[in-house]
Amino acid sequence: MRKNTYAMRYVAGQPAERILPLGSFASIGQALPAGEPLSSEERIRILVWNIFKQQRAEWLSVLKNYGKDAHLVLLQEAQTTPELVQFATANYLAADQVPAFVLPQHPSGVMTLSAAHPVYCCPLREREPILRLAKSALVTVYPLPDTRLLMVVNVHAVNFSLGVDVYSKQLLPIGDQIAHHSGPVIMAGDFNAWSRPRMNALYRFAREMSLRQVRFTDDQRRRAFGRPLDFVFYRGLNVNEASVLVTRASDHNPLLVEFSPGKPEQ
């Protein structure tokens, strides 16, 4: 882990807290503290969105209309402006961000808003070899009502690289976390899978981790070179609903998925 890899936690009424990597889930997964369930319902609603550093109008109205009822909001390119932090802390018990790089005023990176405090938090970063800008990922774990633990992986994959070596390298520590977790998993975000080799690497990783891809009937996901960039993968859950919200509030469209934590599909 790089020494400058950390997460910042935002909670209402408390100062921002720096969270350092705890190490592999393999070493501490059996000793996690008890926590409140992410949801008291028989469903888990998530919103996944590259928010484009909040550079366009209406981003806040989209979050207010579609994010406030979600149990999890997985943002990429989230810039910790006062407006976003205020929304996050007013509507969620915890908001964890992994700063990928610091813009003139506010850090930008993946950010996970959750209706419960995570019992595990592991920030990850990978530097793009060409632009030398970092992309971040965040692994968090939440209790479910059925006593299982849900692992959530929020990913913004490296974009500019020659070949797929760095792309695959970024997935390795994520795979280490998932491989040592026996419960359900949601892995989602902007995977920048704009080439056939990248797509193959991502699908191969998903197969190795026994992850399924959420399918969208009216697939309005952002595309590059004809390939979707945003994905939701899962394991140990059922998909109830999945849709893509078409909006001009970012250069990506938000993904809305509802899961049920009951008996997984066969």
Swiss-Prot record:
Keywords: Cytoplasm. It is found in: Cytoplasm. It holds the Pfam family Exo_endo_phos. One of its GO terms (cellular component) is cytoplasm. SUPFAM superfamilies: DNase I-like. GO terms for molecular function: catalytic activity. Belongs to the UPF0294 family. HAMAP family: UPF0294 (MF_01119). NCBIfam families: PRK05421.1-1 (NF003839), PRK05421.1-2 (NF003840), PRK05421.1-3 (NF003841), PRK05421.1-4 (NF003842). This is UPF0294 protein YafD.
